[in-house]
């Protein structure tokens, strides 16, 4: 990330970053340390409050509570867009990314990571190992019943509109995130687009095993040097 921001500053003289869905600001710290001016948007009011408190004395961070997800459609130009585990929360993620690309200035970058691969392109082994790892993690958390109930609803294609776990994780409704379609949006307007597929799960032990033996479940995209 330091290298990313540094190269943008070298080309453009600054690096103004929009971080979509910043959570509690862990990644924001790295961006600021690298020399970026960061605007973070967060749909969750409690998370936005945590961010405001965390960066209350930092003039290089602006926090916006964006409950309706509309702030990303503003016209102001940007040097970089960062999306950490957030595209699968956006109903029309392709439309959102297409607009964000238009805001990125020449020489800028787009970076996203930790979104689930498009289900129709995944093997049965990939899906089954992913589901099994999730249930084992829930068991370790003492929440196996909750995990099983969520999985059963998803397998049946029936979703509880009152349940945040169902309705904020849009990828389970629309079968993941189409990484190839996103790559197709980025490729014509960036000089270099890298798609990385990898295994990812919540359990540290299962993560270590999966990195060695399991098929990919998740992806990241890194588009450099906007045309």
Regions found by a protein language model. Give the residues of each.
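A short glycine-rich, Lys/Arg-flanked "PGG" loop and its adjoining helix->strand segment in the class I
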Residues: 94-106
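Short alpha-helix
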Residues: 173-190, 195
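Conserved alpha-helix/loop element of class I SAM-dependent methyltransferases that forms part
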Residues: 1-14
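A conserved beta-strand element that flanks and buttresses the S-adenosyl-L-methionine
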Residues: 82
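Core SAM-dependent methyltransferase catalytic element
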Residues: 189-191, 206-227
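Class I SAM-dependent methyltransferase SAM/SAH-binding core
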Residues: 24-70
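Conserved class I S-adenosyl-L-methionine
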Residues: 13-23, 109-151
